[in-house]
Design a protein with these regions (language model features):
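Amphipathic alpha-helical segments used for helix-helix packing
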Residues: 82-85, 97-121
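Helix-turn-helix
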Residues: 11, 15, 19-53, 57
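Hydrophobic alpha-helical connector segments
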Residues: 57, 71-101, 153-157
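Amphipathic C-terminal alpha-helical segment
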Residues: 93-96, 140, 160-177, 190-200
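Hydrophobic alpha-helical segments that form the core
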Residues: 101, 106, 151-170, 182-190
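Amphipathic alpha-helical packing segments from all-alpha helical-bundle domains
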Residues: 81-84, 117-143, 154-158, 185
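Short, low-complexity, charge-dense intrinsically disordered segments
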Residues: 208-218, 226-227
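Short, basic, alpha-helical segments at the C-terminal edge of helix-turn-helix-like DNA-binding modules
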Residues: 60-66
Length: 232
């Protein structure tokens, strides 16, 4: 229709998402969003409502694009490999200069006390979705015997999610993939430890006290010496 500027909603959301991701929610002004999206205030407000509603839509856009690209790796049938691939996707994004630093959800969670309850709920909801996705992979590993049933799958899911969010937080100031790989290597050693535990629990042996071996040897010698020799 003549006189009405047409635009692609997803493209506008991508641009708004990048602006929020780069500057943060509070620091991004309406003028910044107008400049980033290329549409006027009237169209911006008419389509998305206020800044808060646009930000909530940008969070959904982030999850449906950047976030899902990482968590799609969890579909790998090998559970351990699935977790590794999730981390690999995260490292690729974190070390790619075309993306802003950190993660829009992680960055916002650090800023969240000033963002309002609605945004805080959105962050918590997303964290729950991520935790559940990892948890399902771990439960599958327990079902096929590659992860011990004695392990707390929910706690492990929270641990791996914490490592992922930790990488995102570190990424605010560091883009070295070697740093992130070190974090992942240690995290995966936790998996290996959990996988190695037998169903009946780890086999524990009491450490031999220093001197026990020598003491046993002395006792054996004493016993041999106490046996009388037959006289001929």
């Amino acid at each position: 229709m003549a006189g009405i500027k047409q635009f692609d909603r997803d493209e506008v959301l991508d641009r708004a998402m990048a602006a929020f991701w780069t500057r943060g929610y509070e620091a991004t002004s309406i003028d910044d969003l107008v400049q980033a999206t290329g549409i006027g205030r009237g169209s911006l407000y008419g389509t998305f409502g206020d800044k808060r509603q646009l930000f909530l839509a940008a969070l959904d856009q982030y999850w449906n694009t950047v976030g899902m690209e990482m968590f799609a790796e969890l579909s790998d049938p090998d559970a351990r490999h699935a977790i590794e691939r999730m981390f690999d996707a995260l490292i690729r994004r974190a070390s790619n200069p075309k993306f802003p630093r950190g993660c829009l959800f992680t960055n916002t969670s650090l800023e969240c006390p000033t963002c309002g309850d609605e945004i805080a709920r959105k962050i918590a909801e997303n964290m729950g979705q991520q935790e559940t996705a990892i948890y399902q992979v771990l439960r599958k590993a327990q079902a096929d015997g590659t992860l011990s049933q004695t392990q707390d799958a929910r706690a492990l899911a929270r641990f791996f999610l914490g490592v992922a969010w930790g990488i995102n937080a570190v990424n605010k100031s560091v883009a070295d993939p070697g740093v992130f790989r070190d974090m992942v290597r240690v995290a995966m050693s936790v998996w290996d430890t959990a996988a190695a535990v037998q169903i009946d629990g780890p086999r524990m042996t009491e450490p031999r006290r220093r001197g026990d071996a020598h003491g046993s040897a002395r006792k054996k010698v004493a016993v041999r010496r106490s046996v009388p020799h037959n006289s001929k």
